[in-house]
Amino acid sequence: DQLGIHSRTIDITPAVDGYLQYEPDADGRRRGNVMARMRMIVLFDLSAKLNALPVGTGNKTERLFGYFTWHADDSPPINPLGDLFKTQVWQLARYLGVPEVIVSKPASADLIVGQTDEDDLGISYHLADQILYFLLRGYRVEQIEEMGYPREKILLVKARLESTHWKRHLPTTAMLSTTSINDYYLRPVDY
């Protein structure tokens, strides 16, 4: 409302609970993933109704950390913030005049009461973005540590970056023919 943008709130609780009643032992991570996927079902359905496309809000930091639910918040076909670190998204929001109450709200998927991204990740976005910046440019752990960054945080970021690499790719397809549709697929116009 503060931005003058039409919005609609849809309670996904009945749909989520309808499934989770059959999985009473689901932990918080699984429950959060179910909620994120249900939210994406609603967004894609409404986009079909409106003849529109869902717009993603994920950022580079979340993608590099693998901090998203596969086939949920990583699904929108348009993601204008996807190549911006989280701290850059905040800078852009302030530049565009987004109300401070929105910009300064602790980052959260808003699926579990009291949950915050930084608590889940074990590092602040400010520190994570700086470390990611150097890792992506080929700096070694020792070089980043010499700049004054805590070794345990560098190793945490590096481990997340490496262990979630698979989440940033399309599913692997077994190549059984010369026309297999996977990472190497060439459309006829590409030949």
Where are these regions (language model features)?
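Short loop/turn and capping residues at structural boundaries
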Residues: D11, G58-N59, V103-S104, E145, ...
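Alpha-helical scaffold segments in soluble metabolic enzymes
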Residues: G18, V42-D45, Q88-L92, Q130, ...
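Short secondary-structure boundary/hinge segments and terminal tails
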Residues: D17-G18, L64-F65, D110-L111, E152, ...
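Catalytic subdomain that performs nucleotidyl-dependent activation
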Residues: R31-R39, A52-L127, Y133
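ATP-dependent adenylation/nucleotidyltransferase module used to activate substrates
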Residues: D1-L64, I144
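Peripheral terminal appendages
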Residues: T116-Y191
